[in-house]
Amino acid sequence: MLPVRWMSPESLSDGVFTNQSDVWSFGVLLWEILTLGAKPYPAKSNWEVLQYVRAGGRLERPSGAPERLHVIMSSCWCHVPDDRPSFKMCVQEIECLVESGNGASDMSDGYIRYDG
């Protein structure tokens, strides 16, 4: 069984697995963290997820997630693999977000803030 909910369009269609497809999965992981472990595409079957992602569908912004973090996640889900950021770019963007404190006020109750 394949982890369809974490797979990029090219992985789903062609069985291609690269750093870029891993970045896609990282975006889904960020989404899971911000939803405190919710199942990606919760109302869809694996087959529906496959069709949805192929058609350009993406996960919605989690409630209370900072806009800048959602932009990072969305960039991980670009349809064209070469348009996705590298892991290094993702880390740099997240570090800037954490260091600046921007977006912290957007976090709703129930989210854990780690200052460590």
Predicted segments, located by residue:
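Conserved activation segment of eukaryotic-like protein kinases, specifically the C-terminal portion
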Residues: M1-E10
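Activation segment
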Residues: D14-N19
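Conserved catalytic-loop aspartate of Hanks-type protein kinases
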Residues: D22
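Structural helix C-cap motif within protein kinase domains
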Residues: T35-K39, V80
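Short proline-rich PxxP-based motifs
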Residues: V53-G64
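Conserved C-terminal C-lobe helix
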Residues: G64-W77
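A conserved short helix/loop substructure at the end of the activation segment
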Residues: W77-M89
